[in-house]
Amino acid sequence: MVGLLPYPPTRSVRGGAMALIESFLEEDIHPIDIVENIAEHKAWDFDRIAEDQIAMAVEGRWRTYSITLAWSAYDETLRMVCTFEMEPPAHKHGVLFEALNEINDQCWAGAFTYWTEQSLMVYRYGLLLSGGQVASADQISTLISSAVATSERYYPAFQLVVYGDHSAKDAMQVAIAEAYGRA
């Protein structure tokens, strides 16, 4: 009767390609390993600070951005912090924080803050990977490029309110016009 079957009898594929695929899917891919591969591919300067943390320097149009990504297994979150130096005079802090509020209202993912003690403008974002999800290289690459693009977009607005005599609303109009002008 076996000869009458239109196809050979099924056999377990556990030892073949299926086992390899299952092994790959079950394997823990560390998000920082993915980031390191991206940094190497893009030829960015980077330093693997720890098993769960990496720091990079990424060139933008306006300046070089320091980007740090850290993985928290406990929180199941890949946290990205993109920073650049900014030393506003004390009397400009109010208008800077007003600009931060205006800008953050425009940001759909991530948010800016200013770290006064370190004199750093910070754009941060947390990628939640709960339930054992694994971040893809595309997700992480997009996370980094979005951080740089967002920082580049609003950099002129920060400069106008901190070092010029522009209001937060005026500076935002310049940032919006700049974005549309390049589109």
Predicted features and spans:
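Short, internal acidic amphipathic alpha-helical interface segments
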Residues: T83-L120
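Short, highly charged C-terminal tails/helix-capping segments
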Residues: Q159-A183
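Short, aliphatic-rich beta-strand segments
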Residues: M121-Y125
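A generic structural motif
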Residues: F84-P89, L127-A135
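Ser/Thr-rich, low-complexity intrinsically disordered terminal regions
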Residues: N37, H41-Y65, L69-M80, E85
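Long, contiguous binding/interaction regions
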Residues: W115, L127, Q133, I140-E152, ...
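Negatively charged, low-complexity tracts enriched in Asp/Glu with abundant Ser/Thr
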Residues: S23-I38, K42-D45
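Short, Lys/Arg-enriched N-terminal segments with co-localized hydrophobic residues
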Residues: M1-A17
